[in-house]
Design a protein with these regions (language model features):
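Hydrophobic/small/kink-forming positions within alpha-helical transmembrane segments
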Residues: 6-10, 40, 62, 66-70, ...
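Helix-helix packing/entry segments at the starts of transmembrane helices
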Residues: 30, 84-90, 157, 161-173, ...
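Structural signature of hydrophobic alpha-helical transmembrane segments
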Residues: 22-35, 74-91, 133-146, 192-206, ...
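Glycine-/small-residue-enriched transmembrane alpha-helix faces in small-molecule transporters
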Residues: 1-26, 132-156
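Hydrophobic transmembrane alpha-helices of multi-pass small-molecule transport proteins
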Residues: 110-126, 251-270
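Membrane-interface interhelical linkers
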Residues: 1-7, 36-60, 109, 159-161, ...
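Specific transmembrane alpha-helical segments of multi-pass solute transporters/efflux pumps
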Residues: 11, 47-82, 88, 204-220
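C-terminal transmembrane-helix exit sites in multi-pass transporters
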Residues: 74, 91-113, 234-253
Length: 271
């Protein structure tokens, strides 16, 4: 399930990059339309409660996921695709810390060492001091932390709520929030036919990705499942070069390699 989710999220990154001429809130709103239309029908057919059981945690998870998506969409539109995805992949290490605090999953010195290795890799990608504009990088790091929080809450919800309910909360909460902000900003751009097709496809792929991610975290420990997120770096590098002619520099390549290696080492420790 996590491999399916990873493929979906990689495709989402490419589509968001393509849609970079549109406002981020507009992209976010369209991302949630299929979820808001399809999921309620599935819930009704399966006779599952629309509002779920753990409403507070469901809402918290939706807000964390939604704002992490907004941060991710923004950084994808203004940064090299591989760099944006690589920084986002620090989220598994935040997951380790949060899972230790809130879920009681063990953490030891080896994991701390691996975390430091990943952090060094992130520094090579970010290259602090090499450029003046650090705002996109800060947003990317914030997005990684929010992503970690959403994944940990997803793991916590496994005992109380159905995966479809979790996805439904995500779609409605963030669809309504992004629509409200879009109205407030007043910068809606009417998409052309191709952009509209990509926007709708983005929503469908996002729906599959969210469901697969939620199901994966209900089936396995957060630390183990999060390893597969690193595949996005590889997919992002390949797709960024093929579709957008974006070639990461040596610092980014080496930094991404360190993050992937540290993710693999963490995976081996868990097994």
């Amino acid at each position: 399930m996590m491999i399916i989710a990873t493929i979906c999220f990689s495709l989402i990154s490419v589509m968001v990059k393509f849609l970079g001429h549109l406002p981020v809130m507009e992209i976010t709103f369209f991302r949630n339309i299929p979820t808001m239309l399809i999921i309620p029908l599935i819930l009704k057919n399966k006779k599952i409660s629309f509002f779920g059981n753990n409403k507070t945690l469901l809402l918290l998870r939706s807000l964390l996921s939604g704002f992490s998506a907004i941060a991710n969409f923004y950084t994808i539109t203004v940064m090299i695709l591989t760099d944006a995805i690589t920084i986002k992949q620090l989220s598994p290490f935040f997951i380790i810390l949060l899972a230790s605090v809130f879920l009681g999953e063990k953490i030891d010195f080896k994991k701390i060492t691996i975390f430091i290795l990943a952090f060094l890799g992130a520094l090579l990608v970010v290259k602090p001091g090499f450029r003046l504009d650090i705002y996109p990088t800060a947003i990317a790091l914030l997005g990684a932390m929010l992503t970690a929080g959403s994944h940990v809450t997803t793991r916590s919800l496994r005992l109380t709520d159905h995966p479809i309910v979790i996805v439904n909360y995500y779609g409605y909460t963030n669809g309504l929030i992004s629509f409200g902000i879009l109205l407030w900003q007043g910068n809606f751009i009417l998409p052309d036919a191709l952009s509209l097709f990509v926007l709708l496809l983005l929503g469908l792929v996002g729906l599959v990705g969210q469901f697969s991610l939620t199901k994966a975290y209900q089936m396995a420990p957060a630390k183990l499942v999060s390893f597969y997120l690193y595949l996005q770096i590889i997919f992002g590098a390949l797709l960024g070069e093929l579709l957008f002619k974006e070639i990461p520099d040596l610092f980014s390549i080496f930094g991404a390699s360190l993050i992937i290696i540290s993710g693999y080492l963490n995976y081996k420790l868990e097994n």
